[in-house]
Amino acid sequence: MRLNTISPAEGSKPTGKRSGRGIGSGLGKTGGVGHKGQKSRSGGRVKPGFEGGQMPIQRRLPKFGFTSRKSFVTDQVTLAEIAKVDGDTASLETLKAAGLVKKEIQFVKVVKSGEVSRAVTVSGLKVTKGAKEAIEAAGGKVEE
């Protein structure tokens, strides 16, 4: 067997239908497009969102809000994820090393979801009130 002799199994790749090749093909004459009208012409398609001349919905509805650029570099981490960090200190660098946040993240907030069973020192991260209580109850501490 050689690379130039390999071919797909018989019948696994049916040949595509060729339109406009006679009435016996099933796609002759109009080629599956029908008679006249905009959609039978060359280049005859309407753009996405076109509503027949009626004002389209994306223009009828107002613009609103904006996306804060800080949201692209901010993430949140749960207590259950903090427990996965090696060592007893959780900081931005250790979270990145553990693969819990992406490398472009600059700000992290610890939220109370799940439980932390061992003493962990959280440094340089924002912490919610409930998460702070849970960390301190487990014997850990929070350093701003």
Swiss-Prot record:
> Has UniProt tagged this entry with the keyword Heme?
no
Fetch the Pfam families from UniProt. Answer: Ribosomal_L27A
Where composition is biased (Gly residues), the residues are 21-35
- From the UniProt annotation, give the residues forming the signal peptide: none
Q: Where is this region: Disordered?
A: 1-59
Fetch the InterPro entries from UniProt.
Answer: Ribosomal_uL15, Ribosomal_uL15/eL18, Ribosomal_uL15/eL18_sf, Ribosomal_uL15_bac-type
GO biological processes: translation
From what superkingdom does this record's organism come?
Answer: Bacteria
Query: What keywords are assigned to this protein?
Result: Ribonucleoprotein, Ribosomal protein, RNA-binding, rRNA-binding
Listed GO MF terms: rRNA binding; structural constituent of ribosome
Function according to Swiss-Prot or TrEMBL: Binds to the 23S rRNA.
Protein family membership: Belongs to the universal ribosomal protein uL15 family.
- Subunit composition? Part of the 50S ribosomal subunit.
Q: Give the protein's recorded name.
A: Large ribosomal subunit protein uL15
Q: What gene name does this entry carry?
A: rplO
